[in-house]
């Protein structure tokens, strides 16, 4: 059958429109033509009041869950940057702090991205412990419908580099989830590798998920990630403040050198909360710089490039490069450069290599294995200088425009030569009162006083771990908090090492500090530590927990914090009539409720 085209005079189309229509419809099948006729009829009849068949709903947009598992803020900042990248790519993203993530919903996740830091001996960040324990428990579900990616942040100066990221990555795969990308393990100088990873993960997610219109993109950050106090000052742009007080607070016969530091914030407007940390930038000891230059037969006036700028080698070593922390990677590189037989042999023994890197400063490694590096080789060998973080020991409710920290000065000898910690030596020996110091606040929403001032508080902090609890008590006093307060503190000797003794005695006298238990490890034949005191008071501890107490632990992550946690588990099991698995779950529930918080390092 031949279709006759009506005379052009009878058509509502111009000859040009008719030609375009005929060219277009030539590509359609009869079925498509029939559908188009109905489509055009619907367009003509879609007038106000007309009944139109409802459009088929578009499939719900897939949401990418982005978990930040941060210890010192780096993972959080990277997660926020990735969130912004995904939003710019018109992808739906839910950014959540690991401590606020409802991990029992993980089986419903389709696209999961984790940015995870590592602390201590390969442990996850404090805010990620509950999620970590759940994934490694019998309750963890299979995840065959989940695709994931992990970025690990760590420090090669530690033996278990990026272990938390590795554990998350391996466990998710073991549970049946599919990798979007291979895991990336980033060192202290993580910016370049993290930037590449961000670009790769955005591309991988774009390939999985169709982009949404700008109006449709959902950004649902949750938890503490986006509640950080805003400030013009940061790690990259620190405040230049002034040192106002530097005072030794241990006795002259003490084995420890602990300094109380007060810094004047002036009218900077810098704000912090009890539980936050102070980041301090420092310069290396000029004497250490000269010693290293002399060992390598370098003058120090050689020009080197640091962050795209040419400066003298001496300036680079003093203000830009890490000299007081050695790593296995540096030992490995230096062994190749120096061709030293002892160092090369050391590389074959992982345990011995770790021990050597931990206990041998860079300058002493160079002394023991002489070499003739040039300036560029030396710069390439070393890592960028990084600031040190100290738990803040004051509340602005009392100190206003000041911030206080408690610093344990690192001092030791290598082959009869005195060595000092980078930042602690700078604060104790080289920075003068009224001198300039570059600082920033590292906010820590995972170490906060309870919102209810009537809630009891248990504070466990031996040594310099007492610092944040000084801030806590200043805040509780200023708030007129009526909740009970219990401090457990320990150090070697009562007469030499009772940090802030007068202040604690006043709090006891005034009734603000309900009870205090002290452990002096060297004042008797048998060593006594805070964990021993805690175990002795197990029944009382359980009573406080039953009354809703919040438990805080600050200090050494490798020994003290682990021992304290074991005591807590034992006390819960004994007095709560639970088995080990139930006690562990109970402690995890306390963590999720923010009733068990740790600031350990």
Curated annotation (Swiss-Prot):
Catalyses which reaction(s): hydrogen sulfide + 3 NADP(+) + 3 H2O = sulfite + 3 NADPH + 4 H(+)
SUPFAM superfamilies with a match to the protein in the record: Ferredoxin reductase-like, C-terminal NADP-linked domain (SSF52343), Flavoproteins (SSF52218), Riboflavin synthase domain-like (SSF63380)
Quaternary organization: Alpha(8)-beta(8). The alpha component is a flavoprotein, the beta component is a hemoprotein.
Species annotation: Yersinia enterocolitica serotype O:8 / biotype 1B (strain NCTC 13174 / 8081)
Annotated FAD binding sites: 324, 358, 388-391, 406-408, 412, 421-424, 601
Gene Ontology CC: cytosol
Function: Component of the sulfite reductase complex that catalyzes the 6-electron reduction of sulfite to sulfide. This is one of several activities required for the biosynthesis of L-cysteine from sulfate. The flavoprotein component catalyzes the electron flow from NADPH -> FAD -> FMN to the hemoprotein component.
Molecular function terms from GO: flavin adenine dinucleotide binding; FMN binding; sulfite reductase (NADPH) activity
Keywords attached to this entry: Amino-acid biosynthesis, Cysteine biosynthesis, Electron transport, FAD, Flavoprotein, FMN, NADP, Oxidoreductase, Transport
Record flagged with keyword Transport: yes
Boundaries of every FAD-binding FR-type domain copy: 236-450
Metabolic or biological pathway, per its Swiss-Prot or TrEMBL entry: Sulfur metabolism; hydrogen sulfide biosynthesis; hydrogen sulfide from sulfite (NADPH route): step 1/1
Domain Flavodoxin-like: 64-202
CDD domains for this protein: SiR
Protein family (similarity comment): Belongs to the NADPH-dependent sulphite reductase flavoprotein subunit CysJ family. In the N-terminal section; belongs to the flavodoxin family.
Single biological process term from Gene Ontology: hydrogen sulfide biosynthetic process
Protein name (Swiss-Prot/TrEMBL): Sulfite reductase [NADPH] flavoprotein alpha-component
């Amino acid at each position: 059958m031949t279709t006759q085209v009506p005379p052009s005079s009878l058509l509502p189309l111009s000859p040009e429109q008719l030609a375009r229509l005929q060219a277009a419809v030539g590509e359609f099948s009869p079925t498509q033509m029939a559908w188009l006729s109905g489509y055009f009829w619907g367009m003509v009849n879609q007038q106000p009041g007309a009944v139109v068949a409802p459009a088929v709903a578009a499939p719900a947009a897939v949401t990418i869950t982005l978990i930040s598992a941060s210890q010192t803020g780096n993972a959080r900042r990277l997660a926020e940057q990735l969130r912004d990248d995904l939003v710019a790519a018109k992808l739906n993203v839910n950014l959540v702090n690991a401590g606020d993530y409802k991990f029992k919903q993980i089986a419903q996740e389709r696209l999961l991205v984790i940015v995870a830091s590592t602390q201590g001996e390969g442990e996850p960040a404090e805010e990620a412990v509950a999620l970590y324990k759940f994934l490694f428990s019998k309750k963890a579900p299979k995840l065959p419908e989940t695709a994931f990616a992990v970025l690990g942040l760590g420090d090669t100066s530690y033996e278990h580099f990026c272990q938390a990221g590795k554990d998350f990555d391996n466990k998710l795969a073991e549970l049946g989830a599919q990798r979007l990308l291979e895991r990336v393990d980033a060192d202290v100088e993580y910016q370049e590798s993290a930037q590449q990873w961000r670009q790769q993960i955005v591309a991988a997610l774009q390939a999985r998920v169709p982009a949404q219109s700008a109006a449709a993109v959902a950004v649902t950050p949750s938890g503490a990630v986006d509640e950080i106090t805003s400030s013009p000052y940061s790690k990259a742009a620190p405040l230049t403040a002034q040192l106002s007080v530097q005072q030794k607070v241990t006795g002259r016969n003490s084995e420890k050198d602990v300094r109380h530091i007060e810094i004047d914030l002036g009218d900077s407007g810098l704000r912090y909360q009890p539980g936050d940390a102070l980041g301090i930038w420092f310069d290396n000891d000029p004497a250490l710089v000269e010693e290293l230059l002399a060992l390598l037969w370098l003058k120090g006036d050689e020009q080197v490039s640091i962050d795209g700028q040419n400066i003298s080698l001496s300036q680079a070593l003093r203000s830009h490069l890490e000299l007081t922390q050695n790593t296995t990677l540096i030992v490995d590189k230096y062994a190749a450069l120096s061709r030293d037989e002892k160092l090369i042999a050391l590389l074959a023994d992982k345990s011995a290599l770790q021990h050597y890197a931990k206990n041998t400063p860079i300058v002493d490694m160079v002394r023991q294995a002489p070499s003739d590096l040039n300036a560029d080789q030396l710069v390439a060998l070393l890592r960028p200088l990084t600031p040190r973080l100290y738990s803040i020991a004051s509340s602005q409710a009392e100190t206003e425009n000041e911030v206080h920290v408690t610093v344990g000065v690192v001092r030791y000898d290598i082959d009869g030569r005195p060595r000092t910690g980078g930042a602690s030596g700078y604060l104790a020996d080289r920075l003068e009162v009224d001198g300039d110091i570059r600082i920033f606040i590292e906010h820590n929403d995972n170490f906060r006083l309870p919102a209810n001032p009537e809630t009891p508080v248990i504070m466990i902090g031996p040594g310099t771990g007492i610092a944040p609890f000084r801030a806590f008590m200043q805040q509780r006093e200023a708030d007129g908090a009526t909740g009970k307060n219990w401090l457990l503190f320990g150090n070697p000797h009562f007469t030499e090492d009772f940090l802030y003794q007068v202040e604690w005695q006043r709090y006891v006298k005034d009734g603000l500090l309900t009870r205090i238990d002290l452990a002096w490890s060297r004042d008797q034949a048998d060593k006594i530590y805070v964990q021993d005191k805690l175990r002795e008071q197990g029944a009382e501890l359980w009573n406080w927990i039953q009354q809703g107490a919040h438990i805080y632990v600050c200090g050494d992550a490798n020994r003290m914090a682990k021992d304290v946690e074991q005591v807590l588990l034992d006390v819960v099991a004994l007095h709560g009539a639970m088995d080990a698995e139930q006690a562990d779950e109970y402690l995890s529930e306390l963590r999720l409720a923010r009733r068990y918080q740790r600031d350990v390092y």
